UniProtKB/Swiss-Prot annotation:
Residues 541-564 have a biased composition (Basic and acidic residues). Its main location: membrane. Residues 25-127, 131-229 form the Ig-like V-type domain. Residues 25-507 are extracellular. The gene is alcama. The keyword Glycoprotein applies. One of its GO terms (cellular component) is dendrite. This is CD166 antigen homolog A. It comes from Danio rerio.
């Protein structure tokens, strides 16, 4: 029956039972108060007389600790050894052990006596102690590439149970393979406290890649969480296999810049002195790895090298290119030309690489420079030429002014939207901007001037038919043009609501009709004269006139029209 109870208890309370034991287990912490429960608090039966705690001594014999009478508040401590000042009882009858130590790892029994029964409940106590933080000691000063060397010893102290140590490289666990990695661990116990210390020694075969590797030691313990030592890096010694030359100056290199050449070798410790080959000339530098060219010119472009002091064959080469850009533009500044003249624009350039040229006119980008073989007013403006290569840019500009005497290109009229005014529009070309003079008074509506083209508008109220002149002038000449303007009042009488253009159109139609009548009369007269002459010829010869009655009738009608 006892074995069945143990098996059942193992299933329902596995977390509290020690492996291989049927007793519930309590985990206490070293140096702190350990609470040992009495039947998990179910210890107050009816008719309770007293509760007693006892323990199993090292030799297996029982030892009394204390007794608590049900009718009394304070317990009676019966222990005579080290527990005398360390034990007490809680309100729920749990045993309290102050300043827990490894000597408390034993079995404690709670005896509950009532008027009808006597029960005992045993609990096994285990004491855990978190280890000290891991520390790597006896560290090697440097590791040699490819050689098995003891890197260091990791130590943790004062733990229970003993801690496990794991070596890590770059947060990856190292595994003992018996060749390139060998790990040896030892555990020792303090004879007084019984606490354990663990040490682990790592022998490691380094590689060049381990120069930046970080080695740590991790302590794993049941009290958790894991503790990690301070990361350590180690110097790895290996010979130089490759030399590299770098140009550390900003790119691109321009004339006037300072250029720094830096020579590096992959050996460790790295070499500190080098030979620099400056366009065929050897220059030795000691205790540094750089050489500086000051104020370079395009002549400094070429091949540069560096090598070890004791091995000229192991070298590195770099090509240095000094960028330059020479450019000039003709013309520049202010350029004054006449309308229709020719302007030749010349851009000269010389550079270390392909040149990019962009043109803008009045801040607007141009696909290409316009054709200036015959200048127009619209060609005037501020032209900017940007010439550039990577890292270098030059800008040139010229401001072109195209001048010409004024010329009127159009003079028109129309009635205003409200029908109460006449609006005259005079359009002219010229530069400088022409000034306008009208032969009649009116209101200047608006004036615009764009690309040598000027537009002037005048609003008038003609009370009679007028001939209006538009005169435009500038310092280079003048031009004038006339236009007929009819009175608004006369136009309103015959055809109210019609505009002046409609009146003019009616006059044209009347003229055309009259012209057609006159042409018809003229044709009839000519035809009549022709018939008359023909008849006279017939009378002279005595020949009878031939023709149908319809033709005769048509001739008489035409003659009649001609007489009219």
């Amino acid at each position: 029956m006892h074995s069945v109870i143990c098996l059942f208890g193992a299933f329902i309370a596995a977390a509290l039972f020690a492996p291989g034991s049927c007793l519930p287990t309590v985990i206490g912490l070293y140096g702190e108060t350990i609470e040992v429960p009495c039947n998990n608090g179910n210890n107050k039966p009816d008719g309770l007389i007293f509760t007693k705690w006892k323990y199993a001594k090292d030799d297996g014999s029982p030892g009394d600790l204390l007794i608590k009478q049900a009718q009394k508040d304070d317990p009676t401590v019966s222990a005579m050894d080290g527990y005398k000042t360390r034990v007490s009882i809680a309100a729920n009858s749990s045993l309290l052990i102050a300043q827990g130590s490894l000597t408390d790892q034993r079995v404690f029994t709670c005896m509950v006596v009532s008027s009808t029964n006597l029960e005992e409940f045993s609990v096994e106590v285990k004491v855990h102690k978190k280890p000290s933080a891991p520390v790597i000691k006896n560290k090697v000063k440097e590791l040699e590439n490819g050689k098995l060397t003891q890197l260091g010893e990791c130590v943790v102290e004062s733990a229970n149970p003993a801690a496990d140590l794991i070596w890590m490289k770059n947060n990856q666990a190292l595994v003992d393979d018996g060749k390139t990695i060998i790990i040896t661990s030892d555990v020792t116990k303090d004879p007084v406290t019984g606490l354990s210390s663990t040490s682990s020694r790592l022998q490691y075969t380094a590689r060049k890649e381990d120069v930046a590797s970080q080695f740590t030691c991790v302590a794993k313990h049941v009290t958790g969480p894991n503790q990690v030592s301070t990361p350590d890096t180690f110097q790895i010694r290996y010979p130089t296999e490759k030399v590299s030359l770098q140009v550390v100056s900003q790119s691109p290199i321009r004339e006037g810049d300072d250029v720094t050449l830096k020579c590096q070798a992959d050996g460790n410790p790295p070499p500190t002195s080098f030979n620099f080959n400056i366009k065929g000339k050897k220059v030795t530098v000691t205790d540094k790895d750089v050489y500086t060219l000051t104020g370079v010119t395009r002549a400094d472009s070429g091949v540069y090298k560096c090598s070890l002091l004791d091995n000229d064959v192991m070298e590195s080469t770099q090509i240095v290119t000094v960028s330059f850009l020479d450019a000039s533009l003709t013309p520049t500044g202010k350029v004054l030309k006449k309308l229709g003249e020719n302007l030749v624009v010349s851009l000269e350039k010389n550079a270390s690489s392909e040149v990019k040229v962009t043109w803008t006119k009045d801040n607007r980008k141009l696909d290409k420079l316009p054709d200036f073989s015959q200048l127009r007013y619209s060609d005037a403006g501020l032209y900017v030429c940007d010439v550039s290569i990577e890292g270098i840019k030059h800008s040139f500009s010229f401001e072109l002014t195209v001048e010409g005497g004024p010329r009127i290109t159009g003079l028109t009229k129309h009635r205003s939207n409200d029908g109460k005014h006449k609006v005259l529009t005079c359009e002219a070309e010229g530069s400088p901007k022409p000034e306008v003079q009208w032969s009649v008074n009116g209101t200047d509506d608006e004036t615009s001037y764009v690309n040598g083209k000027a537009t002037y508008k005048l609003t008038v109220v003609p009370s009679k038919n007028l001939t209006v002149s538009c005169l435009v002038t500038n310092k280079l000449g003048f031009d004038t043009k006339d236009i007929s303007v009819f009175s608004l009042f006369e136009e309103d009488k015959p055809k109210p609501g019609k505009n002046e253009d409609g009146a003019d159109q009616a006059k044209v139609i009347v003229g055309v009709v009259v012209g057609l009548f006159l042409a018809a009369a003229l044709v009839g007269l000519i035809y009549w004269l022709y018939i008359k002459k023909t008849r006279q010829g017939s009378w002279k010869t005595g020949e009878k006139e031939t023709g149908t009655s319809e033709e005769s009738k048509k001739l008489e009608e035409n003659n009649h029209k001609a007489d009219v």
